Amino acid sequence: MKVFESGQDWKIAALRNHFHVHFLFGDYMKKKYFDIVYEQANRAFNAGEIPVGCIIVKNNVVIARSHNKREKMNSVLGHAELLALQDASKLLGNWRLEGCDVYISLDPCPMCAAALSQARVRGIYCAVSSTNNDEKAIVNKIIPKKTKFLSDLDVERSSTLLKNFFKNKR
């Protein structure tokens, strides 16, 4: 499985000066990342899974991507975040994903938040926040203060996809 985005070779060469790359392309890249996350969430939706997509980025390069596969795998561990963490760890040869940022279509559940915390990711960026306030409070306690954690960064697309999924289930 190819995890790097095609056409990112120029970025890899430019990453020696990460500050300038982030300064020049930061907002543009975040939009591109959420486009990939949304694509992954759509894959889950089309497979009859809860539409959650996740990517992991290191040095502005997508190193892992996944979507929910609980039904397909018949496993509670088939969450998009856990699958992406496994792929990123395998690629980097290390379970510590320091310097990595995670982009998710929905706030992580407590189980995934704990895994992200253990992986020592630098930042967690979510398209839409969970509507479960109890779960949100638990997740906020799990994620370390040093980890950047932002939600509601791409609300319209992800919330519409989630609403359509659950509307079709009822």
Regions found by a protein language model. Name each.
Residues 72-82:
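A short, polar/charged loop-to-alpha-helix boundary motif
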Residues 52-57:
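Short beta-strand scaffold segments in enzyme catalytic cores
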Residues 94-106:
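Immediate flanking context of iron-sulfur cluster ligation sites
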Residues 63-70:
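Short beta->alpha transition motifs characteristic of CBS
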